């Protein structure tokens, strides 16, 4: 019981730290994602750079996302991730197709030594929020909420 309480408090404290970090660094977005495999992430981003922290482990990732194509109907971006604790860099090309009220996307993560997960999903923007529902090839469903500033 105490362990569960401490875990909830730790996640709440991490959320407040991320909010403080986001507001103090003038971030453009802050997000929270949880997955059916038990993983959860807090992220903040500014001008193509993103910092993501996995809340159930000490795991951090830095990302630079370069948009190669950004049109009214399509966005093709090429994020370069660096996973700090694993000392591993990966690429994760993403293609988004924009419709009137939502966007469909597909992405594939890999590096030179390893073929990693593919993921598919839907982004639904509502005012300053974006809701994401997705699935990846490890049979995990993901849900994400992002607030734009």
Q: Residue locations for each model-derived region?
A:
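Cleavable N-terminal export/targeting peptides
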Residues: 1-31
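Outer-membrane beta-barrel pore domains and translocons
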Residues: 33-37, 52-56, 67, 79-85, ...
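Outer-membrane beta-barrel "beta-signal"
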Residues: 93, 119-128, 137-149
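Acidic, glycine-rich flexible loop segments
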Residues: 107, 115-121
């Amino acid at each position: 019981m105490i362990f569960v309480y401490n875990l909830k408090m730790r996640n709440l404290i991490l959320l407040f730290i991320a909010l403080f970090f986001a507001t103090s660094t003038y971030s453009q977005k802050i997000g929270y994602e949880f997955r059916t495999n038990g993983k959860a992430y807090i992220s903040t981003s500014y001008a193509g750079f993103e910092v993501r922290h996995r809340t159930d482990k000490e795991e951090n990732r830095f990302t630079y996302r370069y948009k190669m194509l950004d049109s009214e109907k399509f966005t093709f971006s090429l994020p370069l991730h660096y996973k700090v604790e694993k000392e591993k860099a990966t690429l994760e090309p993403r293609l988004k197709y924009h419709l009137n009220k939502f966007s469909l996307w597909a992405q594939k993560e890999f590096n030179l030594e390893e073929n990693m997960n593919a993921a598919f999903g839907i982004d639904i923007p509502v005012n300053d929020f974006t809701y994401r529902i997705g699935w990846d090839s490890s049979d995990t469903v993901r849900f994400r909420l992002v607030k734009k500033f």
